[in-house]
């Protein structure tokens, strides 16, 4: 999961920055959206690389509260305000007061929740590392991929944005080429897995595939997470269509690439397609 991995790397980059400024030993981290696919992926990808002894509160909306997260590094972890049972932590319901005493808040909750709680996080003195699209194009919010523009972490005003997954894997490949010779144009086609649509999308792929193989017709299949049947199909429609008939996913790749690379003159043409694969986005990139 490129978004979870990148959020983790931004987290570590921020930890290094806070430590270099004399932050206390043992930073407190809060993970908002712990019970969802993005938050859970972020939890797994961090492994034991988080500074030992740091608190790791798991926070979620009302639906996810009470969910078990699992032991961290194979050990029980005593976390402030959380119940640590045999084999795991219990997720708490998130509220504005959840971020008191937290240094870094990892958000994987969706844009609406991130916008709603931004003020509470920053007022508590924490740094929000946000996995949603809420702040990516805000001028005062750095959009960071550590392998590409790690220095941008330094100018945050309390929020650091994590790019779209399809943008992340592309700019990581573009950066060393750009360092050799400035890039003029990029044509990219993406083949994006169901995981990009979250747990409901993956469940729908599984269910539809099973139903299709059992002989059900298109009319009998349940279609809710995608615009069309995803089983044995490719859908060139990720997010909503815009006025120029491109999709918002394609627009994200264009504008995010320019911001991350620090070059508004790069021309980017993107075609984004959802494919019937559980995990693993693929891209074909032509670079001039």
Q: Model-flagged regions — what are they?
A:
Residues 16-230, 266-267:
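N-terminal Rossmann-like NAD(P) cofactor-binding subdomain of oxidoreductases
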Residues 227-278:
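Oxyanion-binding "anion nests"
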Residues 279-283:
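Conserved glycine-rich beta-strand-loop-beta hairpin in the small C-terminal domain of fold type I
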Residues 286-288:
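Short hydrophobic/aromatic beta-strand micro-patches
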């Amino acid at each position: 999961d490129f978004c979870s991995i990148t959020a983790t790397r931004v987290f570590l980059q921020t930890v290094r920055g806070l430590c270099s400024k004399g932050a206390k030993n043992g930073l407190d981290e809060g993970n908002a959206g712990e019970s969802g696919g993005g938050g859970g992926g972020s939890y797994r990808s961090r492994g034991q690389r988080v500074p030992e002894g740091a608190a790791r509160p798991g926070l979620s909306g009302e639906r996810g509260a009470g969910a078990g997260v699992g032991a961290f590094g194979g050990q029980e972890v005593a976390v402030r305000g959380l119940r640590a049972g045999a084999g795991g932590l219990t997720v708490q319901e998130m509220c504005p007061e959840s971020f008191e005493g937290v240094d870094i808040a990892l958000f994987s909750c969706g844009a609406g929740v991130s916008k709603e709680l931004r003020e509470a996080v920053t007022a508590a003195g924490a740094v929000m590392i946000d996995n949603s699209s809420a702040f990516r194009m805000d001028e005062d919010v750095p959009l960071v991929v550590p392998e590409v523009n790690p220095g941008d972490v330094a100018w945050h005003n309390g929020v650091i944005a994590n790019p779209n997954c399809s943008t992340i894997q592309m700019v990581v490949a573009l950066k060393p080429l750009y360092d050799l010779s400035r890039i003029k144009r990029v044509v990219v086609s993406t083949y994006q897995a169901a995981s990009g649509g979250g747990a409901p999308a993956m469940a729908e792929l599984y269910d539809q595939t099973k139903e299709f193989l059992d002989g059900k017709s298109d009319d009998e299949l349940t279609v809710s997470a995608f615009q069309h049947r995803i089983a044995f199909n490719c859908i060139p429609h990720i997010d909503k269509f815009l006025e120029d008939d491109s999709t918002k996913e394609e627009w994200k790749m264009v504008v995010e690439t320019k911001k991350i690379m620090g070059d508004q003159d790069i021309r980017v043409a993107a075609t984004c397609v959802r494919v019937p694969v559980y995990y693993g986005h693929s891209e074909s990139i032509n670079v001039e």
